[in-house]
Amino acid sequence: MANQPQVSALLLSLLVLSLVQSLHAGGIAIYWGQNGNEGTLTQTCATGKYAYVIIAFLNKFGNGQTPEINLAGHCNPSSNGCTIVSNGIRNCQNQGIKVMLSLGGGIGSYSLASPSDAQNVATYLWNNFLGGKSASRPLGDAVLDGIDFDIEQGSTQYWDNLARYLSEYSKQGKKVYLTAAPQCPFPDRYQGGALNTGLFDYVWIQFYNNPPCQYSSGNSANLVNSWNRWTSTITATKFFLGLPASSQAAGSGFIPADVLTSQILPAIKSSPKYGGVMLWSKYFDDQSGYSSAIKNSV
């Protein structure tokens, strides 16, 4: 009986440690859609690895163009072949997984010419992918959770207008989540203005293909310094560490799983805005098993 206070104190310490760890627990976001060999959306969410799935990409829109979605080898949107994705979207959402549509990407034809052009794109997105109505919804009748900005080319203006117009649709019922994947050099050349609106829920920063602010040869200082600048300057609900899921997924910036879990994550998880890790992409994650190796540490 004399040892009971010590045991109680130990249990209390363990409970406090568990609470602290749970407060900083994050989720994994994954990009899906650019390789037909990465499995369906339903299969992706059935793995239990991911909290967010970003469908990539709507890579033609704006400046008067007819918008087009490109899901690589998954389906052919020109023949309405991608409406079957609705089943996958709903299956994911039924598991509590948020599903977004990503705008842009590294290859495509997209830009915004004016505030009115941004409004037209927002209206199109609302009617064709969100809570609006259209006879030509490319992914069928499922209602996505939000829109992801992965703007890497084209115009540098009016993305803030697009964010504001999309945010306004949250007033019509279901919240429209806004997410973004800026490059780690601060500020982002294309999305800086949009991110300054403070309207974004999740920001998954690309810490790869950018040597000045990525992990390199055992040096994590540039990455951590960049992370701290982003999280202390931009207003967003949560920030995510964006990484390639394998060394083949990007030209540079891959972090071995053991280095990520032992060195990088402990250095950034103290941030109150820490949300988890974003990976490019589902196909490369399948090949490497990266998410399985890091999941318990994220």
List the model feature ranges, each with a label.
Residues A2-V7, Q21-Q263, I268-P272, F284-S297:
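Chitinase-like catalytic core of GlcNAc-active glycosidases
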Residues L11-S18:
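Bacterial N-terminal signal peptides
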Residues Y274-S281:
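Long amphipathic alpha-helical assembly cores
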